Regions:
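Short, flexible helix-loop junctions that flank or precede catalytic/ligand sites
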Residues: 2-340
Length: 340
């Protein structure tokens, strides 16, 4: 069992730094339990000590601003970003349970990885060459969507001269200006909502808009409008494959599905669905992708509502950079990157 003794002072912040050094992706703190970290998808104890109510009250006092503390007291939960040190940023969710404070914390490397370091498929990297339209990075929670998007934005920042505007909840990776001007807006503090930020973005002369999550009908509708009007829009959804992704978007609009099918057929440029699998050595994880790029045939299928036929076109679309997740996993197995 991984173990360490907590030091005096701000115990929880010290613990987070240690978890980061151990390669943890997440930390969970609950009064009455040992502090836990998620490594390679598995929950493990970080320390032998039991987290106390005093520990969590001290931790909350250390990380919450006056505004966040007011919100936390008002609604019992708050989501925000926190810079732990020069190497690690955190996406923190503090919440109340059983009359005590608990926390779920995502640890994020401050250094933004490149597309090459992540091993992203070339088709995904090539999304940066698009001039307009909608590109969706999808997958379950903790599948690396935010990291993939950060690498894509970083590639644009290094290679092109443009205005990039991001809408995030909260801001995870911070981008320093290179060739691009980058404005990163945080939902809650910089803008009221994703939808409000998107509507405002249309008046802020962006070339690229990144939306942290298409949460609702209003956000989806505005993202489609932005993509239609000449912007390149990157966004995420919690879907596992391309067919489900297209169906989810259409289902957002039960009252005018034909219009949405036509809009989506016109502006969708690509979908990359990802999930993380244990690598063959048991000491890390590898991303598996399903990739759909757009051809005239695929646009016609979406326009005509024949979404169920998309998968067969993806299976035979290798010359367009397409691949199903099943085929991608078989490829990883053949390369010895994951176990059969």
């Amino acid at each position: 069992m991984l173990s360490m003794q907590l030091r005096e002072g701000d115990k929880m912040l010290t613990l987070l730094e240690q978890a980061g050094k151990m390669g943890a992706s997440d930390v969970h703190l609950t009064v009455g339990s040992k502090p836990m970290m998620r490594c390679q998808g598995k929950l493990l104890p970080i320390a032998d000590n039991i987290v106390t109510a005093t520990d969590m009250e001290s931790f909350a006092a250390a990380v919450l601003t006056k505004h966040l503390n007011t919100e936390f007291k008002r609604i019992g939960e708050v989501d925000f970003a926190y810079s732990l040190n020069d190497a690690i940023r955190c996406r923190m969710n503090l919440f109340r349970q059983c009359d005590s404070i608990a926390a779920a914390i995502r640890l994020i490397a401050a250094q933004i990885p490149t597309c090459e370091e992540l091993g992203l498929p070339q088709t995904v990297c090539d999304f940066t060459a698009l001039k307009n339209g909608l590109v969706l990075i999808t997958g379950p929670t903790c599948s690396g969507k935010s990291t993939t998007l950060a690498a894509i934005i970083n590639k644009l920042n290094e290679e092109q001269s443009m205005h990039i505007l991001t809408l995030e909840d909260p801001v995870e990776y911070k981008h320093a200006a290179k060739k691009c001007i980058i404005n990163q807006r945080e939902v809650g503090s910089d803008t009221k909502s994703f939808a409000a930020g998107l509507r405002s973005a249309l008046r802020e002369d962006p070339d690229v808009i990144m939306v942290g999550e298409l949460r609702d009908k209003d956000t989806m509708s505005t993202a489609l409008k932005a993509a239609e009007t000449g912007h390149l829009v990157f966004a995420t959804l919690h879907t596992g494959d391309a067919v489900t992704t297209v169906s989810r978007i259409i289902d957002f609009f039960p009252e005018n599905q034909q219009q949405i099918k036509s809009q989506l057929a016109a502006c969708l440029q690509g979908i990359a669905c990802q999930e993380l699998l244990p690598n063959a050595y048991g000491n890390g994880r590898v991303a598996a992708f399903e990739i759909m790029t757009m051809t005239p045939a695929l646009r016609n299928l979406i326009r005509e509502g024949k979404v169920h036929q998309l998968e067969s076109f993806i299976q035979t679309g290798i010359q367009y950079g397409m691949i199903t997740k099943a085929d991608y996993i078989r490829k990883l197995q053949q390369e010895g990157k994951v176990q059969k």
